[in-house]
Regions:
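Conserved N-terminal beta-strand and adjoining loop/helix that marks the start
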Residues: 135-158
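Short, acidic/hydrophobic/Gly-rich beta-strand patch recurrent on exposed beta strands
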Residues: 159-163
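Hydrophobic N-terminal alpha-helices or hydrophobic patches in metabolic proteins across all domains
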Residues: 17-139
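Charged phosphate-binding loop/patch that engages nucleotide di/tri-phosphates or the phosphate backbone
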Residues: 128-138, 252, 258-278
Length: 278
């Protein structure tokens, strides 16, 4: 069966490879459903009042008719990105909800053109799914961070950190939290992970997109910042090590092409601004 084959494939894949540094998975055997296109037959349209549960539906909800194996434990699907009642909807699975006290899972489906991250989905299903009563995995993730530099003994040095969940050097970054904008997330993450306060340089914003093991579609936004703080205090629970390196050594320490491209752009920016001469 497709469900059993895909489930086995995902479990083997995740056992064989480490995920990106800030990706946390749950009920990994269902990850194969993320990104799939399904057809939903709506049984509880938007604004429907469920007398038994005493709730009014803020989203269309229904049964998944096609796109997944009949043996899968899917009990239904919420539809996001649609602001009116529909009878049938075809869209992409953007999240999987596993209720802690009930069997089976619930999908969250949206149009291909719509992108929602975890806290947006949590807010949308709050009318029926109370936070803390379920686990959730999402197709889309958004992280923000910063390339931080400072002048040490007359030389420009860049901050690299190594996360305990990754063997690779990178920049401080993390998931956006509810109510934050991109710069607020980047500021908080640098402060949490490195213990330093930063100032953002204007007109530098680098966005990259990639997938984690072909299942999670991630967007990362990186800013350029500097600091007057001279003491780096890493978050020991998450960060293993840090370094302040000159440009060439920092480039050699980075593994991923996206990170190298970001640092190269940041270095060019500083050269053009006359902040550094090498």
């Amino acid at each position: 069966m497709l469900y059993l084959q895909e489930r086995k494939k995902i479990c083997i894949m995740l056992d064989s490879f480490s995920l990106a540094s800030d990706f946390v998975g749950c009920f990994r055997e269902f990850l194969y459903m993320l990104g799939k296109y399904v057809r939903v037959r709506v049984t509880k349209p938007m604004h429907f009042f469920d007398k038994e549960k005493n709730i009014s539906y803020d989203l269309n909800f229904g049964n998944v008719e096609s796109g997944i194996d009949a043996l899968s434990p899917v009990k239904g699907a919420y539809i996001m990105g649609v602001t009116h009642r529909v009878r049938v909807f075809e869209g992409r699975v953007i999240a999987i909800i596993k209720r802690k006290d009930l069997g089976g899972i619930i999908l969250v489906v949206a149009p291909k053109s719509k992108r929602y991250i975890v806290h947006q989905i949590e807010d949308a299903v709050e009318f029926a799914e109370k936070r803390g009563t379920y686990d959730i995995n999402c197709l889309y993730e958004s992280s923000c961070g910063a390339i931080v530099y400072r002048i040490i003994n007359g030389e420009t040095r860049f901050l690299l950190i190594k996360n305990k969940r990754s063997a690779n050097w990178g920049f401080p970054k993390g998931h956006m939290e509810r109510g934050e904008n991109e710069k607020e997330t980047a500021y908080r993450e640098v402060l949490e992970e490195a213990g330093i306060r930063i100032r953002f340089l204007p007109d530098f914003r680098f966005r990259s997109e990639y997938s984690i093991q072909g299942r999670i579609e991630k967007q990362v936004v990186i800013f350029l910042a500097t600091t007057d703080d001279t003491t780096t205090i890493i978050q020991r629970e998450e960060i293993e090590e840090y370094l302040w390196l000159k440009f060439d050594k920092a480039m050699n320490s980075l593994k991923f092409p996206n990170d190298k491209q970001m640092l190269r752009k940041a270095h060019e920016y500083l050269l053009n601004a006359g902040v550094t001469n090498g």
